[in-house]
Regions:
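A short, polar/charged loop-to-alpha-helix boundary motif
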Residues: 425-441
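Cysteine-centered motifs
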Residues: 13, 17-19, 28, 36
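Hydrophobic positions on the alpha1 helix immediately C-terminal to the Walker A/P-loop
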Residues: 232
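Flexible phosphate-sensing "switch/lid" loops adjacent to ATP/NTP-binding sites
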Residues: 42-220, 236-398, 405, 412-414, ...
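Short HxH-centered metal-ligating active-site micro-motif
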Residues: 439-471
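Conserved glycine(s) of the Walker
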Residues: 227-228
Length: 516
């Protein structure tokens, strides 16, 4: 840990997100048997608040997509936005939503669905990196193919958009073909997206390859934004109508949620998550005019709708939709079962995004001031400030009580806040982690789960033999030490088995955290 960023500018982490407790992150998804630690210990009751009905969502969302398929000629191109396998943002702001809910929903449609992955040739040539995984977009396409096939979903092909001849692109296509994956090419179109007459012609979409598909539901997905998902869908509609198939298009995105208020914290949290893109939630004026009903969409979809609508009219003779909201199929808003739980979770997420922005600004220096200003504005709209969370307040109180040394606070699911200080054996975050496990297992805080005699040789190894400067144990190191102690110490074993109960806890550190 470093104190270079002490004070109010601190890191907020959520354990099932990109988080400093990587070991806890994985442990949370394992099924660990609960071991009794004796009658003298009273374990803290797990009281995670649920605001979203995930089972209802899976059933309602899959059924709604089936209904949309039937509205067309049993052929629907579904533009799939957001993260499919690991939507941790949704799981944080909608407690009860599972990170893989969208994948599970698709699995209910797997006999009808096939996947087409699109990637821009420009991203292949530039070796564009996916920030959350740290891998290039072309490698992420291969990862997605393996992941889809691994759960039984059919991957029909890969489409290279904005195609230009380049050695990197040709090598990528060959690699896919060698793996038995078909590839298709879509080209840059002059005047896109405004010259609608040229786009919807033999010289526009007509130049693109027709992607051969087999199933009623074609899910168009990509490694990241700007890959050309919508353009691919519309190009396919053009070719389908040329072949006499009256196919349809729909858009699946979880956020913003169209049927909750514009300034609902869940929707504000979406703006916070996309502050770098400067997305803005808006009332859909087209929907309001057509139906007299207020719904929420975001600026890019609203701005492009007249163009998309004109394309529909040229392709099909008339547009099936009167508004951007009409194009969507999102049912998440209908599955919120406790609005206040979702509001509170979203408020925390907005502040977390603010701290994340400050951390990135400090670490990389690449964050624009406009992003920070927007996050401050969103906090103000939600009635929040940097001290709105109990963990922030108590982490700084603990730091002040220990002479300004780094401190960490963890809020358990029942609202109890556990703190950890910097000591001679453990860093503040490792200390908070152990203290939280003790609290969950009903173990007195003064109990040593790992003896100093066991920790000191690890410190010697770190500093004398591995070249480390900081002798204090980090989170991963104390968990390994705790695991070793659990073999002979029943209390340590009881604490270890509480790891899954840290899932979703709110954490605040008064300093930036080093990687472990």
């Amino acid at each position: 840990q470093t104190t270079a960023f002490a004070g109010k500018t601190a890191l907020l982490c959520v354990l099932h997100c990109t988080c400093f407790l990587s070991v806890v992150y994985y442990a949370c998804y394992g099924k660990m048997p609960v071991r009794c630690a004796g009658p003298a210990m009273r374990k803290r009751k797990r009281t995670m608040k649920i605001g979203f009905d995930n089972d209802k969502y899976l059933a309602m969302q899959s059924e709604h997509i089936r209904e949309r398929i039937q509205k067309f000629d049993n052929k629907l191109y579904l533009e799939f936005g957001g993260k499919l396998f690991d939507d941790y943002h949704a799981s944080r702001v909608l407690p009860g939503f599972q990170p893989d809910s969208k994948l599970q929903m698709l699995l209910q449609l797997k006999d009808q669905a096939e996947i087409v992955i699109v990637i821009s040739a420009e991203d292949i040539v530039s070796s564009k990196i996916r920030g959350d995984y740290g891998i290039t977009y072309d490698l992420d396409v291969l990862r997605l193919i393996d992941a889809f096939q691994g759960v039984g979903l059919y991957v029909g092909s890969v489409c290279v958009t904005k195609y230009t001849a380049a050695p990197e692109v040709e090598a990528f296509e060959k690699r896919l073909n060698d793996l038995g994956i078909r590839t298709f090419r879509h080209y840059k179109i002059a005047g896109y997206p405004n010259d609608v007459a040229h786009i919807v012609s033999d010289e526009g979409y007509g130049r693109n390859d027709y992607i051969e598909t087999e199933r009623p539901l074609v899910v168009i997905t990509a490694p990241g934004p700007g890959s050309g998902k919508m353009a691919t869908c519309l190009s396919q509609l053009y070719h389908e109508y040329k072949r006499g198939v009256k196919a349809g298009y729909a858009k699946f995105e979880t956020f913003p949620i169209w049927n909750i208020p514009l300034k609902h914290p869940v929707n504000l949290a979406y703006e916070a998550a996309t502050a770098d893109l400067n997305d803005v939630n808006m009332i859909d004026p087209f929907h309001l005019e057509a139906y007299g009903v207020t719904t929420v969409n975001y600026n890019r979809d609203i701005e492009i709708f007249p163009v998309v609508n004109a394309m529909f009219e040229l392709i099909a003779g008339k547009s099936p939709y009167k508004s951007p909201t009409d194009m969507g199929v999102n049912m998440a808003g209908n599955c919120i079962v406790d609005d206040e739980v979702c509001r509170e979770a979203s408020r925390k997420e907005i502040v977390r995004r603010y701290f994340k922005c400050l951390c990135q600004q400090k670490i990389t220096g690449t964050v624009h001031e406009s992003e920070r200003y927007k996050l401050e504005l969103l906090m103000n709209q939600a009635g929040l400030n940097v001290g709105s969370r109990a963990v922030e307040q108590q982490a700084h109180a603990r730091s002040e009580a220990t002479g300004g040394a780094p401190a960490t606070a963890i809020e358990l699911s029942d609202g109890t806040v556990i703190t950890g200080k910097t000591g001679p054996l453990l860093g503040a975050t490792a200390s908070a982690l152990i203290n939280a496990l003790k609290a969950l297992a009903g173990i007195p805080q003064e109990t040593d789960l790992v003896s100093a005699a066991a920790i000191e040789p690890i410190q010697t190894l770190k500093t004398n033999y591995l070249g480390g400067k900081n002798p204090r144990l980090h989170t991963d190191e104390i968990l390994i030490a705790l695991s070793s102690s659990a073999a002979t110490n029943e209390l340590a074993a009881a604490a270890l088995h509480q790891l899954p109960n840290l899932k979703g806890c709110d954490v605040h550190s008064t300093v930036l955290l080093s990687g472990v």
